[in-house]
Amino acid sequence: MENLIIYAFIYLLGSIPFGLILAKFFAKTDIKKEGSKSIGATNVLRVVKEKNPKLAKKLAIATIILDFAKAAIPLLTLKFLHYDQALLWSVAVLAILGHCFSIYLLFEGGKGIATGAGAMIVLLPLEVLTAFIVWVVIGKIFKISSLASLAALLAFVVSSFIFNYDLEIHTHAPVFIIAFIIVYKHLPNIKRLIFKEECKVI
């Protein structure tokens, strides 16, 4: 029963669309109706930038921090309280599911990058560092957020086998589930990348 309460709480917390809330409150803009219609930091930056570039950067950074924290803080807390790895991985997946398929937005949501990073920094920090380096390099070269994110995701999955071939839960299934969710949410971006129609944001 305790685990079910934790799972429900994490999903509901992960579902909070911080980007949407911040853009509506501070920029009076509904990012669900503009840009890519995503609730993540990239769309916050893209949409708000048209009206107020300085505010756009602040709101995008705040969105990243809050989306990151809504997974990282609960996982850190549960890890500190010595909950087992199986529960921690379940919580990680649920936090990302909540962000990508928010109950508050009729199961629409963001792309899962910041929330995924927040979850994984607790469980696989070295892999997240590797992914971040790849994200920065690809972002600097191509200036395309989705391409950088997908490259970072690939680096994360590959490095999870290099640095942690045998995870404590004895399976990489949660890593693949998380990767699948994020790739699924990026399918429109992948299509635009293939046809060279993806916008440069970074």
Curated annotation (Swiss-Prot):
Q: Main site of residence?
A: membrane
EC no. given is 2.3.1.275
Alphabetically sorted, this entry's keywords are: Cell inner membrane, Cell membrane, Lipid biosynthesis, Lipid metabolism, Membrane, Phospholipid biosynthesis, Phospholipid metabolism, Transferase, Transmembrane, Transmembrane helix
GO CC terms in record: plasma membrane
* Record carries keyword NADP: no
Q: Name its GO BP terms in alphabetical order.
A: phospholipid biosynthetic process
Cystine pairs annotated here are none
Query: What are this entry's molecular-function GO terms?
Result: acyl-phosphate glycerol-3-phosphate acyltransferase activity
Entry keyword Transferase: yes
What is the protein name stated in its UniProt record?
A: Glycerol-3-phosphate acyltransferase
Q: Which organism is it from?
A: Campylobacter jejuni subsp. jejuni serotype O:2 (strain ATCC 700819 / NCTC 11168)
Taxonomic classification? Bacteria, Pseudomonadati, Campylobacterota, Epsilonproteobacteria, Campylobacterales
Gene that encodes the chain = plsY
